[in-house]
């Protein structure tokens, strides 16, 4: 189904561009907003986003724009692909223009200092808007190159989910729906932390047993933490949980994996992030997740270990020794799903 009005995508990064392309390929008129006029002009003239998605042609139906006020006025369905550190700053001045809009967050991050997810920030800024999120095993370049992909749109608003499914669903991109917005969004944010650890392990040439252990124990940690906050544990067995975790912890295309790999090669955190040239949400998420898990007394040894390496001066060897000598635990915590 084609929307009667143009659809907005806010953000000029790789994921925003990939989603804008999908929408345009499905016959939607798309306005992709970005702050940088030079970037917008490059996309307009070269039909390519050379900074973030080099080599991928931008569909003619995608119009790069820099006038945010007009974009918000012209569009009803708005996909928000802004970094977690910028979302509030960009949208707060346009609060009135967001009333009654359908706002769908694509950002897998947590706001520093508040521990708010992106949809919670959108609710604060635009309490009269209708809110949803998209998350899943979705590497931007693979989406743009038409690899078969599935994602999850989550909202308590069934009509919003249906409209997003109709707008995005295509021959290579399948969209499932969920009502557990909090769990879907939390899964997308948390897995970024473990992707850094997976990249670090790969750079150190650790074995397949080790990598498998990291992914499965990461899933246990994520689920334990999310359930404590009220998420449905079953969400973490789906695309937005284990699906996203596997792809992000296995693929060199993942930004957070790349940061971890650079650290394993001997670069400092600052050098690793700088080499990326694009936001890796996992670094910021790690800081707030460590603080929150300590506050809530949730057992998260992998989070504590990675935090010790990145911010406390511990070596990987020291952390491995502490993890392997830790108190024996059960493999799986059985969590009742009644009430979700």
UniProtKB/Swiss-Prot annotation:
Key words, A-Z: Cytoplasm, Lipid biosynthesis, Lipid metabolism, NAD, NADP, Nucleotide-binding, Oxidoreductase, Phospholipid biosynthesis, Phospholipid metabolism
Keyword Acyltransferase included in the entry's annotation: no
Pathway info: Membrane lipid metabolism; glycerophospholipid metabolism
Protein's recorded name: Glycerol-3-phosphate dehydrogenase [NAD(P)+]
Active site per database record: 191 (proton acceptor)
Gene Ontology, cellular component aspect: cytosol
Organism: Pseudomonas aeruginosa (strain LESB58)
Entry's Gene Ontology molecular function annotations: glycerol-3-phosphate dehydrogenase [NAD(P)+] activity; NAD binding
Subcellular location: Cytoplasm
Amino acids binding sn-glycerol 3-phosphate: 108, 136, 191, 244, 254-256
GO BP terms in the entry: carbohydrate metabolic process; glycerol-3-phosphate biosynthetic process; glycerol-3-phosphate catabolic process; glycerophospholipid biosynthetic process
EC number(s) on file: 1.1.1.94
Function: Catalyzes the reduction of the glycolytic intermediate dihydroxyacetone phosphate (DHAP) to sn-glycerol 3-phosphate (G3P), the key precursor for phospholipid synthesis.
The keyword Oxidoreductase is annotated on this UniProt entry: yes
Reaction(s) catalysed by this chain's protein: sn-glycerol 3-phosphate + NAD(+) = dihydroxyacetone phosphate + NADH + H(+); sn-glycerol 3-phosphate + NADP(+) = dihydroxyacetone phosphate + NADPH + H(+)
InterPro entries, per the entry: 6-PGluconate_DH-like_C_sf (IPR008927), 6PGD_dom2 (IPR013328), G3P_DH_NAD-dep (IPR006168), G3P_DH_NAD-dep_C (IPR006109), G3P_DH_NAD-dep_N (IPR011128), NAD(P)-bd_dom_sf (IPR036291)
UniProt-annotated binding residues for NADPH: 14-15, 35, 108, 140, 255, 281
Family: Belongs to the NAD-dependent glycerol-3-phosphate dehydrogenase family.
Protein origin, superkingdom: Bacteria
PANTHER family for this protein: GLYCEROL-3-PHOSPHATE DEHYDROGENASE (PTHR11728), GLYCEROL-3-PHOSPHATE DEHYDROGENASE [NAD(+)] 2, CHLOROPLASTIC (PTHR11728:SF1)
